[in-house]
């Protein structure tokens, strides 16, 4: 393992970030954050409780009036300054992200952190072009449409892309003029707390408040808090049900980006070199811990026997290991719970004669990796899309492969899922690509690539994969409410009474 001086990047302990100050939790309790690549403890973070949530929400509420009333240009300048400072600290923040999450530094330094910075920059531009409208309904009647912030936003983000997912919430929420209480996962909170140091230097007091704690404790308290006017959550569908219920109970608008079991469809005219890279992007990027992962690989029967051996070889040549080794292509799963979940699905495959593990399927413990949570890139062949392995989200570097004969069968298999977050199509026939894309019941379709999520392209799911869209200009509407000002310009009575 690369020898990283952790204290150059991570403090020994962190408090809650409330009203621009780092402070201990009301209970004084803490949580320990560990490095999943070697099992070593990284830092202690404050464990927020209900009183801390109350305090953070009050700080956000107190800051809302002044923050929401500043000019668009000034608010955009704040966002641009945050973006600039994130870019300046790319090496620092990317190192923190890799240490706490286990993902390769080559990903955090070129994707996670730069794209997080870009979200603030992008929504600064969205803000300055976000305009209401005037409609002259008739000669004596005028309708003004005004976009206004919702108020205090309560957000909780998952552990797989901590700083990036936080930026997906914070960029549009702040641009719209809201204040925010946000909580990262208890297993990966450090990059967002480090980001809070930038907020402390740049933003007015109380505009962003960062809590650390358990999702079932402080996270739940955020979602049920009477002072929170908008909910935003990225995580599992199981937890998403509870967030949706919390929003429904108080009639609070809710944005959800949840699970997926996305189909990556390979047609027989596809460029196989591009396919092999695309399949790996789909399921090995971020160790397969991606809600949009191409975890179901649908291969046209006529090229199945040609493609599978090449894919097997490619998976077996992936270097898994030290996240700071520049040759590492895949690193540690985020923790023991996730590794256990992956292994439970491997056991299902091993005990079922309808499933064939073509390659992988084992934890990696050699070459100094025994203290971390590393897993082999895995391919499992199945012949029934109703199989548990094809229907449930594994959330790891495990792809299940199925055959299809024609375009219509591919569409039917792809749509046979309770999820609808993403999907991929590999073909050189643009007509086929567009026809299949239109027929797939999913929010994002990649054609001849996979897992590209830049600012400016809407991302979000159909069905049980969520509600709302992110990383796109319309995402600002998630954090706005529309006011109509209806004006009678006639200066005359209507004669009705």
From Swiss-Prot:
Report the leader peptide range: none
Could you tell me the EC number(s) of this protein?
A: 1.2.1.3
Respond yes or no to whether keyword NAD is given for this record.
Answer: yes
Q: Which domain of life is it from?
A: Bacteria
**Residues engaged in binding NAD(+):** 213-219
Q: Where are the catalytic residues?
A: 257, 291
Recorded catalytic reaction(s): these are: an aldehyde + NAD(+) + H2O = a carboxylate + NADH + 2 H(+)
Q: Which InterPro entries match?
A: Ald_DH/histidinol_DH, Ald_DH_C, Ald_DH_CS_CYS, Ald_DH_CS_GLU, Ald_DH_N, Aldehyde_DH_dom
Q: Name one Pfam family in it.
A: Aldedh
In terms of Gene3D superfamilies, this protein maps to: Aldehyde Dehydrogenase, Chain A, domain 1, Aldehyde Dehydrogenase, Chain A, domain 2
> What UniProt keywords are attached to this protein's entry?
NAD, Oxidoreductase
Instruction: List GO molecular-function terms, semicolon-separated.
Output: aldehyde dehydrogenase (NAD+) activity
User: Does Oxidoreductase appear among the keywords?
Assistant: yes
For this chain, the family text in UniProt reads: Belongs to the aldehyde dehydrogenase family.
Name of this protein: Putative aldehyde dehydrogenase AldA
Primary gene name: aldA
């Amino acid at each position: 393992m690369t020898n990283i001086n952790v204290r150059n990047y991570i403090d020994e302990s962190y408090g809650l970030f409330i009203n621009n100050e780092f402070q201990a939790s009301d209970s004084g309790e803490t949580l320990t954050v560990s490095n999943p690549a070697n099992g070593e403890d990284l830092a202690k973070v404050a464990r927020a409780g209900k009183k801390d949530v109350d305090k953070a929400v009050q700080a956000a509420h107190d800051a809302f009036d002044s923050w929401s009333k500043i000019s668009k240009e000034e608010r955009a300048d704040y966002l641009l300054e945050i973006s600039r400072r994130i870019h300046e600290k790319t090496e620092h923040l990317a190192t923190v992200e890799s240490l706490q999450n286990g993902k390769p530094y080559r990903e955090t330094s070129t994707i996670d952190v730069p794209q997080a910075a870009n979200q603030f920059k992008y929504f600064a531009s969205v803000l300055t072009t976000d305009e209401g409208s005037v409609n002259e309904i008739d000669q004596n009647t005028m309708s003004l449409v005004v976009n206004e912030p919702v108020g205090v936003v309560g957000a909780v983000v998952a552990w797989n892309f901590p700083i990036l997912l936080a930026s997906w919430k914070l960029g549009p929420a702040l641009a719209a003029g809201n204040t925010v209480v946000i909580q990262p996962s208890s297993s990966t909170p450090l990059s967002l707390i480090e980001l809070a140091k930038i907020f402390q230097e740049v933003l007015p007091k109380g505009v962003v408040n960062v809590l650390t704690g358990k999702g079932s404790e402080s996270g739940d308290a955020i979602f049920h808090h009477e002072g929170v006017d908008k909910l935003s959550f990225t995580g599992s569908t199981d937890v998403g049900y509870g967030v949706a219920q919390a929003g429904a109970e108080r009639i609070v608008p809710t944005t959800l980006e949840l699970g997926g079991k996305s189909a990556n469809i390979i047609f027989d005219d596809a460029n196989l070199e591009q396919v092999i890279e695309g399949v790996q992007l789909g399921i090995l990027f971020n160790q397969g811990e991606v809600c949009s992962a191409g975890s179901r690989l649908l291969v046209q029967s006529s090229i199945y026997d040609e493609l599978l051996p090449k894919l097997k070889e490619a998976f077996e040549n992936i270097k898994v290991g030290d996240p700071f080794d520049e040759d590492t292509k895949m690193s540690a799963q985020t923790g023991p719970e996730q590794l256990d979940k992956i292994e439970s699905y491997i056991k299902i495959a091993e005990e079922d004669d309808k499933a064939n593990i073509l390659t992988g399927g084992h934890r990696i413990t050699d070459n100094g990796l025994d203290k971390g949570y590393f897993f082999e890139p895995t391919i499992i062949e199945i012949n029934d899309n109703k199989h548990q392995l094809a229907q449930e989200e594994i959330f790891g570097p495990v792809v299940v492969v199925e055959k299809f004969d024609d375009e219509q069968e591919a569409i039917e298999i792809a749509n046979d899922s309770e999820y609808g977050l993403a999907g991929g199509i590999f073909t050189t026939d643009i007509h086929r690509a567009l026809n299949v894309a239109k027929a797939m019941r999913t929010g994002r379709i990649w054609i001849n690539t996979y897992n590209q999520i830049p600012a400016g392209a809407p991302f979000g799911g159909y069905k049980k994969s969520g509600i709302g869209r992110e990383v796109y200009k319309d995402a600002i509407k998630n954090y706005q409410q529309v006011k109509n000002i209806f004006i009678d310009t006639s200066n005359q009575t209507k004669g009705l009474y």
